[in-house]
UniProtKB/Swiss-Prot annotation:
Alphabetized PROSITE patterns for the sequence: FIBRILLARIN
Swiss-Prot/TrEMBL GO biological process terms: box C/D sno(s)RNA 3'-end processing; tRNA processing
Top EC class for this record: transferase
General function of this protein: Involved in pre-rRNA and tRNA processing. Utilizes the methyl donor S-adenosyl-L-methionine to catalyze the site-specific 2'-hydroxyl methylation of ribose moieties in rRNA and tRNA. Site specificity is provided by a guide RNA that base pairs with the substrate. Methylation occurs at a characteristic distance from the sequence involved in base pairing with the guide RNA.
Superkingdom of source: Archaea
Binding residues annotated for S-adenosyl-L-methionine, in chain numbering: 87-88, 105-106, 130-131, 150-153
Full protein name: Fibrillarin-like rRNA/tRNA 2'-O-methyltransferase
Subunit-structure text: Interacts with nop5. Component of box C/D small ribonucleoprotein (sRNP) particles that contain rpl7ae, FlpA and nop5, plus a guide RNA.
HAMAP family found in the cross-reference section: RNA_methyltransf_FlpA
EC number(s) recorded for this UniProt protein: 2.1.1.-
């Protein structure tokens, strides 16, 4: 068994040192022995950790790249917009531990993959729906402490504001992975990031952290905001 050193860097998020100088992060396995996307499982003091691959997770990439504000914590209720097949939501569920994570996905085929890979995580609630229409799933999703958005749409920032108005508690947090090329392929990404930030601020957010997630994802920026409403 490999000798590793594990250190908590955020609530339920750990740095893992194999002694090779490479940056790695992990979450404690909520379902020991169960892989979601082929991730490596490692052990320290009889605890199983899942290595979090930043090449397959924008949140993982942001943490590796120096994210300072990580609002997803143990006991915090989360709405995850753009769940895909469940890679990042599975780590978010590990972090939330005893609290619910509502995972919204638009495509039925992808949602089936999500359910197959994440069905043993009992705190992960699959929701089939369109992030542009929060009213359609308002009978399922309760008020949450954090919204995380990874939706490749031109109106990414507007989608976050719309969902915050429905579901985010006052002074709750939101994290959004802004994909510049989904907004406008003709503009400079920095210009797009500034425009999306302006939409978020005017919509009711105070931006408290920004992290570029290259080289893991090109032309992507992670923003963290506190919801002040409007």
């Amino acid at each position: 068994m490999e000798k590793i050193r594990v250190k908590e860097i955020f609530d339920n998020v750990y740095s893992v040192d194999f002694g090779d100088g490479l940056k790695r992060i992990a979450t404690k396995s909520l379902v020991p022995g169960k892989r979601v996307y082929g991730e490596k499982l490692v052990y320290s003091d009889s605890i199983e950790y899942r290595i979090w691959n930043p090449n397959k997770s924008k949140l993982g990439a942001a943490i590796i790249n120096g994210l300072k504000k990580m609002p997803i914590k143990k006991g915090e209720k989360v709405l995850y917009l753009g769940a895909s097949a469940g890679t990042t939501p599975s780590h978010v569920a590990d972090i939330a531990e005893n609290s619910l994570v509502y995972a919204l996905e638009f495509a039925p085929r992808i949602m089936r993959e999500f359910i197959d890979s994440c069905n043993e995580r009992k705190n992960l609630i699959p929701v089939l729906g369109d992030a542009n229409r929060p009213q359609d799933y308002s009978n399922i999703v309760e008020k949450v402490d954090v919204i995380f958005e990874d939706v490749a749409q031109p109106n990414q920032a507007e989608i976050l504001v719309k969902n915050a108005k429905w579901f985010l508690k006052e002074n709750g947090y939101a994290m959004i992975s802004i994909k510049a090329r989904s907004v406008d392929v003709t503009k400079n990404p920095r210009e797009i990031f500034a425009e999306q930030k302006k939409i978020l601020i005017e919509g009711g957010f105070e931006i408290v952290d920004e992290v570029n997630i290259e080289p893991f994802e090109k032309d992507h920026m992670m923003m963290v905001g506190i919801w002040k409403g409007n």
